[in-house]
């Protein structure tokens, strides 16, 4: 079930360095929210705080709240691994497990989280590959290495792997940056379908992509190199691209900087 994200007063650190400062926003369920902004503005760091991947980096920590419906993901006793089951992630470069088959890539998370009969795994693998619009392309090569697929197919395999464990939220960190235009279009079409089931947040440097796929867009910026990134504004995507409230947003979108 897709869930709502409410972030309030969030600061993220690497050691003593404040990477992002005082971020507050709401991400509605069954929607696509895009994060845009210049390199180094903290949008990917913020994305990673939404499933506690930020903590994997030595010295990574946050203060503030990230609520998934009524649950504080940083509350006492909350297991970060359990958080990452609820809030899945797709990374910038396709990263299928290189020694695993297509089938085993999709089934990996299920096997890690519990015991399943072969028939149950078969059903979930097919459902997930269909959900990622990949089934018809790989159904006859399920036992072949996932690394043998094309780049676009590998990224859809990673999406299938992420949705197999039925998360509530799907985070995507520049999922098309390493792909050709045809593969990018396939991923964008897939995002439009997946938002019917999941809450989706995507980081992208491609503003045309943000305009095409998202319902809401958040613009991040920083005052100078070495300063923390901040959320400048978030609004309906059409409004952000046609009539933003902040001059810096308009300057970035129009190409005056960034």
From Swiss-Prot:
Enzyme class, spelled out: translocase
Cellular component GO terms, alphabetical: plasma membrane
Domain ABC transporter, first and last residues per copy: 5-247
MF terms in GO: ATP binding; ATP hydrolysis activity; ATPase-coupled phosphate ion transmembrane transporter activity
Binding, ATP: 37-44
Membrane association type: Peripheral membrane protein
Pfam families on file: ABC_tran (PF00005)
UniProt KW RNA-binding keyword: no
Biological processes annotated in GO: phosphate ion transmembrane transport
Principal place of residence: membrane
SMART domains: AAA
Location(s), subcellular: Cell membrane
Record's keyword terms, sorted: ATP-binding, Cell membrane, Membrane, Nucleotide-binding, Phosphate transport, Translocase, Transport
Superkingdom of the organism of origin: Bacteria
Assembly and interaction partners: The complex is composed of two ATP-binding proteins (PstB), two transmembrane proteins (PstC and PstA) and a solute-binding protein (PstS).
Function: Part of the ABC transporter complex PstSACB involved in phosphate import. Responsible for energy coupling to the transport system.
Protein name: Phosphate import ATP-binding protein PstB
UniProt organism field: Streptomyces coelicolor (strain ATCC BAA-471 / A3(2) / M145)
Recorded name of the encoding gene: pstB
């Amino acid at each position: 079930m897709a869930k709502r994200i409410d972030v309030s007063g969030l600061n993220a650190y690497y050691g003593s360095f404040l990477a992002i400062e005082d971020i507050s926003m709401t991400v509605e369920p069954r929607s696509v929210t895009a994060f845009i902004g210049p390199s180094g503005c903290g949008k990917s760091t913020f994305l990673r705080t939404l499933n506690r991947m930020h903590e994997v980096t030595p010295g990574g920590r946050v203060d503030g709240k990230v609520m998934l419906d009524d649950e504080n993901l940083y509350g006492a006793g909350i297991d970060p691994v359990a958080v990452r089951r609820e809030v899945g992630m797709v990374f910038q470069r396709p990263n299928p497990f290189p020694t695993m088959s297509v089938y085993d890539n999709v089934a990996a998370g299920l096997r890690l989280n519990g015991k399943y009969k072969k028939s149950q795994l078969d059903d979930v693998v097919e459902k997930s590959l269909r959900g990622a619009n990949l089934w018809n392309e790989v159904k006859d090569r399920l036992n072949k290495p996932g690394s043998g697929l094309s780049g676009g197919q590998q990224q859809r395999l990673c999406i299938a792997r992420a949705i197999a464990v039925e998360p509530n939220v799907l985070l995507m960190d520049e999922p098309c940056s390493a792909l050709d235009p045809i593969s990018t279009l396939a991923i964008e079409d897939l995002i439009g379908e997946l938002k019917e089931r999941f809450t989706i947040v995507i980081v992208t440097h491609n503003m045309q992509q943000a305009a095409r796929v998202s319902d809401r867009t958040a613009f991040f910026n920083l005052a100078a190199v070495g300063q923390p990134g901040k959320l400048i504004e978030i609004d309906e995507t059409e409004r952000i691209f046609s009539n933003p409230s902040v001059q810096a947003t308009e300057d970035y979108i129009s190409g005056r900087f960034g």
